[in-house]
Amino acid sequence: MGKYNFDEIIDRRGTSCNKWEYNVPEDVVPMWVADMDFAAAPEIREAMQKRLDHPVYGYTHHSKELKDAIVSWVGRRYHWDIQSEWLGFSPGVVPALVMSLLSLTTPGDRIVIMTPVYHPFYSSIEENGRVIINHQLDCDKNGYYSINFERLEAQIDNRCKAIMMCNPHNPVGRVFTGKELEELFAFAARHDIVVVADEIHSDLILEGEHIPAITLNEAARQRVILHHSASKTYNIPGLPVAFAIIPNEKLRHKYEEVAATMHAPFDTLSFDIRQRRGAGWKICGERRYL
């Protein structure tokens, strides 16, 4: 593994660690949350320490360097060019899902989720006065989950304003195909619905190909808010940074109005360092180890 030691056992107790200390008996190995026990890449730790040594932790802005790092990463990872002005920011993907719903919808509007799904999808809708449309994915005898578009068509009405999509899907493990995504966005276009896409696990696919929603076609690009974060990729969920890619100017301005008051002193640094210097930790180390 070279300089990255994924066999090191690290005791996280005594650090207010949710995974190990939040109502977890000492004789239980916790596997309930997507939070790995690998040490952060040394490049990230060194850069964070350098910033910590500066005595002022004030407000920060999302710099050109940060945006350039994201644009570069998306280009290298998915071979797709985005524009830096399409980017929006948040403290994490879950807050970003809420921000998207607040910017797109009003209380009483209906939102599609495809279940079983990551539990914050439920709370982000219900706790903000929106209504869930529960589309239960079909599951065949081999445990393969899929969208039933005929049934989905019958579930919605003109009060439905958004579809929340998790791709790769948590927890069923599906990576939706290009054909499925094209059908989903055609469905959204027919009903004038925006797709809010959580693609946070897309860097951790072991086999096959992840197709970002924004790469399908121009029509899909104008109907999606795509959320991503390096927190799962680099195992740094405690650092508050996520980004959205929003090509549609109207949707982006609405999102920015909700996001305008959110700042964190280390978000720009942590993402910039992860993408520029820590890529080997993920590409050559973590994923191969897993």
Q: Where do the PLM segments sit?
A:
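N-terminal small-domain helix-loop-helix segment of the aminotransferase-like
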Residues: 2-92, 99
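PLP-dependent aminotransferase class I/II
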Residues: 62, 223-290
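Short acidic capping loops at alpha-helix termini that bridge into adjacent secondary structure
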Residues: 81-87, 107-110, 159, 221-224
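Conserved PLP-anchoring active-site segment centered on the Schiff-base-forming lysine
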Residues: 103-125
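A short helix-loop-beta submotif of the ANL/AMP-binding
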Residues: 127-133
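Helix C-cap/helix->beta junction micro-motif
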Residues: 128, 190-191, 220
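Active-site phosphate-binding strand-loop segment of PLP-dependent enzymes
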Residues: 138-208
